[in-house]
Regions:
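C-terminal outer-membrane/trafficking sorting elements
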Residues: 454-544
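Ser/Thr/Asn(+Pro)-rich, low-complexity disordered segments
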Residues: 25-445
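Bacterial N-terminal signal peptides that target proteins for export
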Residues: 1-10
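Intrinsic disorder/low-complexity segments
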Residues: 24, 29, 449, 482-485
């Protein structure tokens, strides 16, 4: 839960862990130092994803799969960070940063920890209770640390990463089958009815010391939408369908800086659920009444966040069209706090890079320039081992020293969804997710199901190459809505054209081309389709 992290700094003083981060595994290829200055967009996005993955690989205990909440020496595990990390491993396999076998082994180790860890109502020595998990765990013992709460939202984010991994490892291989069975067992053990405590909605937390006392009910709008979807879809301990109306009862629909949408000032609330669930083209009753989707809602929130920065009512240094993005993060004054806008919430001039970066599927036309601006203008102080540091305040010349797992995770996942949609595509196919959406009364949106203002509106279409990663050759399919000139080319991560796959007038309809890897070194490439003013890019990985 985001609201508990302000306690982190004080607790860390009295809870130092003496072991450092595990050494970088030899199975990974080191990208080497990155020079500051201009990068192509593909290179910048690739660097952001790679460094985010490195966080989850290096800041983990390989013996149990737990991931540190933050990069600080002595940090406990955040189970939400573990969930983000499981998806990061799947993405890394597609990029060739870790082999499928090594990545699967790490995931199986993680699943074993959460399946076999002791459950119970005791205050110590357990990993969770009623199939749910404590927010923070000791990195070595994998049991509750501090007086951490049994956190429903952090459990849901953990489960989301597990489900994504389950969907990724989809072959008949015995280890893939074992992985899928473990995920099903862990997810279906969760007693979501217990988490409701006989109330109308899902409670935020529980502790052995006070039970549900002091913990409120999750009421929207915020990051907990995915929690309700998973709890509604459980085949073993589901919550009643009526809980969705409890969730929507707190919605604040208003207009901010020219955008009308469900308001929640920190951008993480518009991102977390969307990391895994594809809300394009579907609506619940509330969104049917408003004529948009939750995806479009997040797009509007993103645009409003930028407009707030342009208006800059607080007159903070640097704010403008290419420097924006407020969310919960480290802070030079308060240690850790939920910044947000609009309306302004705890805004003191602190920008959090994950706020813009993790909004890239919603509004790439404003996110990508912001990422370039942050890298080019502030890179010397802002960019380090794991990419952009957690936050910075230009007016105070302050840069955070830490990286946070729950801020790194959305970066790698949302960039991947922007480029390939792969996480969305596999996650929505899980039966529990489909059931949860159905029980929440989601229906296909009117018309095409994709709003014209969305960057993924129907028109020029480009499919992911098959297979990906590929050896030798792959097939790329694309659809041209009307006859016209078409250009399809392959670029390396430095933005250099290395293959021309199509360049001429083509008829409307579907076209297939062969992509040969002959003469090219292994690595990540981008292929770009352009026609009649539209452009789409996707990533592919060549293995030798």
């Amino acid at each position: 839960m985001r609201r508990h992290r302000a306690l982190y700094g004080l607790a860390l003083v009295v809870a130092l862990w003496l072991a450092g981060a595990p050494a970088r595994a030899s199975s990974l290829t080191d990208p080497g130092p990155i020079a500051h200055g201009s990068l192509t967009t593909p290179a910048l996005l690739d660097s952001l994803q790679r460094t985010a993955f490195d966080y989850f690989w290096n800041e983990a205990n390989p013996s149990n799969g737990l991931v540190k909440d933050r990069s600080t020496l002595g940090s406990p595990c955040s189970v939400a960070a573990v969930g983000f990390g499981l998806s990061a491993i799947c993405i890394a396999i597609d990029h060739g940063w870790v082999t499928r076998e090594v990545g699967r082994d790490r995931i199986l180790t993680t699943l074993d920890t959460f399946w076999n860890g002791p459950q119970g109502s005791g205050a110590t020595g357990t990993i969770g209770h009623m199939g749910l998990f404590y927010h923070f765990l000791d990195m070595n013992t994998a049991t509750r640390t501090w007086t951490s709460e049994l956190s429903t939202i952090d459990t849901a984010l953990l489960f989301a990463g597990m489900i994504d991994a389950r969907q990724y490892f989809d072959t008949a291989d015995s280890l893939d089958v074992e992985l899928r069975d473990l995920v099903d067992a862990i997810v279906h053990r969760a007693n979501w009815e217990f988490a409701r405590n006989f109330g109308p909605g899902i409670r935020m937390g529980w502790t052995p010391e006070t039970g549900f006392g002091g913990f409120g009910t999750w009421v929207g709008y915020n990051e907990a939408m995915i929690l309700y979807i998973l709890a509604l879809g459980s085949p073993t301990h589901p919550v009643p369908a009526s809980t969705w109306f409890t969730w929507t009862s707190g919605y604040n629909w208003s207009t901010q800086y020219g955008q009308t949408y469900l308001v929640f000032p920190p951008l993480f609330g518009h991102q977390y659920s969307h990391c895994w669930i594809d809300f394009r083209g579907i609506q619940d009753f509330f969104m049917v009444s408003k004529g948009i989707t939750y995806f479009e809602n997040s797009r509007r929130a993103t645009i409003a966040a930028r407009e707030y920065s342009i208006a800059n009512p607080g007159a903070f240094t640097g704010y403008g069209p290419n420097l924006w993005g407020l969310t919960a993060s480290d802070d030079p004054i308060f240690g850790y706090i939920a910044h947000g806008a609009p309306p302004a919430q705890n805004d003191n001039g602190t920008i959090t890079p994950t706020a813009a970066a993790s909004s890239i599927p919603f509004a790439p036309e404003i996110v990508i320039p912001a990422l370039h601006h942050m890298y080019d203008t502030y890179g010397a102080g802002l960019w380090s081992t794991y990419g952009f540091k957690d936050a910075f305040n230009p007016g105070l010349n302050w840069y955070a020293t830490d990286y946070l797992g729950i801020d790194q995770g959305p970066i790698i996942i949302m960039i991947e969804n922007y480029l390939t949609g792969s996480v969305w595509n596999r996650f929505n196919e899980y039966a529990d997710v489909a059931t949860g959406l159905t029980r929440a009364n989601f229906v296909p949106a009117a018309g095409t199901g994709v709003l014209p203002s969305s960057p993924t509106a129907v028109g020029l279409q480009l499919a992911q190459n098959v297979p990906n990663p590929f050896r030798g050759s792959a097939t790329i399919s694309y659809t041209v809505p009307t006859s016209g000139h078409v250009s399809l080319a392959l670029f390396d991560v430095l933005g250099r054209r290395v293959r021309t796959l199509a360049d001429g007038v083509e008829a409307a309809g579907r076209h297939d081309v062969s992509l040969s890897g002959e003469g090219l070194p292994s690595g990540v490439y981008f292929y770009r389709l352009e026609s009649q003013g539209e452009r789409i890019e996707k990533r592919c990985t060549l293995l030798k």
